[in-house]
């Protein structure tokens, strides 16, 4: 599992603590395209973002994928049900946590019962300590850190 990291240091002043922000890329899919296709047509290299959706009536650990503040899909649960939940907890716990998403292909049906899904790369960033915890999670075999 190859990891790609970038770090930025925010310089310390008397009143501002030093925060080390690290990022990693994860290959994934945006699920629910068949539901949201009337409001979103994904294009390769398009940028969208992930945002927690704790009031989702179907999944209280849902991570919505949004474009212009509108839901256009969700992150998948993953084969062991922990993928979206792990990202949800990370985004909720880390005040510097972000999930930027880049579309990498056209919608496909993977034959897993989740309908049409859009291939993407999640650009996850946050505090170095929180990213270390995220890296240690065994979310699923099909979602790999780059």
Predicted ranges, named:
Residues 1-146:
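Conserved active-site motif detector
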């Amino acid at each position: 599992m190859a990891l790609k990291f970038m770090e930025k240091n925010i310089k310390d002043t008397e009143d501002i603590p030093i925060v080390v922000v690290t990022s990693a890329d994860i290959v994934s899919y945006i699920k629910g395209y068949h539901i949201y296709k009337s409001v979103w047509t994904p294009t390769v290299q398009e940028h969208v973002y992930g945002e927690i959706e704790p009031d989702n009536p179907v999944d209280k650990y849902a991570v919505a994928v949004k474009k212009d503040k509108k839901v256009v899909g969700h992150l998948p649960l993953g084969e062991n049900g922990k993928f979206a939940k792990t990202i949800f907890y990370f985004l909720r716990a880390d005040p510097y946590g972000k999930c930027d998403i880049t579309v990498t292909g056209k919608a496909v049906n993977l034959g897993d019962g989740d309908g049409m899904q859009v291939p993407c790369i999640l650009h996850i960033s946050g505090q170095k300590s929180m990213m270390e915890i995220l890296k240690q999670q065994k979310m699923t075999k099909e979602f790999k850190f780059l």
